[in-house]
Amino acid sequence: RITNIIGDKSTAKTALATEALINFVFKYKDGNAAYRETEAAFDKEYAEAMGLPVKKIDFGNPDKPLLTVEDFERDLTAFIEKQGPKVPGIYVLDSLDALSDEAEMERDIGEATYGGNKAKQLSTMFRKLARKIEMSNVLLIVVSQVRDNIGAMFGEKHKRSGGKALDFYASQIMWLAHLKILKKTINKVERPYGILIKSSVRKNKVAIAHRSAEFEFHFGYGVEDLTASVNWLKEIGRLGSIGLKT
């Protein structure tokens, strides 16, 4: 299946993908995990401090980074074919926005067709990849950034770049929004320790869609799921001021 995580800066997109990698590695001992970073912003030491077993993650060839949509298609296809149809696998692309297409790399940036070919290329690529992923036991997580929907009088004010291909081929589409910075006072000095994120699932073929939840991301730790779970239990009336209701 394909999962698309979309969000603006500081919405824990990479952190959420990292959490998925951590959970996968510890659950599937015989599985294969790959992370492809296209923005030159991923810190392995920080990810390891959050619990990611970096030695068990395939980070690709640093001498041959993914630059284009075509590079990504070839790399993911090789990953799927290498592990076979039965072995569980997870492949994270972070992010789709940093990829160009081969035609764009060759032409002048001032040409009128700039950017249009990438959307067409992505549509063709995901149509082919969706079938390969369906026949395999691989989860593909695609991280996307948001762009202002310039000229939009109605509807969404933001959109992802690269066209609408993932709207059709993704099984899950999750939008993340930054709500506020979490702070606490230490020795009379207010210090930030995390961020509060709202996650809205706008498409879901494996569970109930159009649901939202808030969770905390703590710097140097990751997703604070315990607090999120407690808040959810309070919200649905299963947790009182003392403890669980019977």
Please give the residue ranges for each predicted region:
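Glycine-rich P-loop/Walker A and Walker A-like loops and their local beta1-loop-alpha1 context
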Residues: R1-Y28
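Hydrophobic/aromatic beta-strand patches that form the interior of the parallel beta-sheet core
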Residues: T3-I5, A34-R36, D58-G60, I141, ...
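Generic beta-sheet signal
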Residues: T3-I5, G89-L93, V138-L140
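Residue-level signature of catalytic and energy-coupling elements of molecular machines
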Residues: N4-I5, A47, D94, S144, ...
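Conserved inter-motif catalytic segment of the P-loop NTP-binding fold
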Residues: E19-A20, Y28-T124, K128
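Phosphate-binding/switch region of NTP-binding enzymes
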Residues: G115-I236
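Terminal-proximal interaction/regulatory segments of ATP-powered molecular machines
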Residues: I242-T246
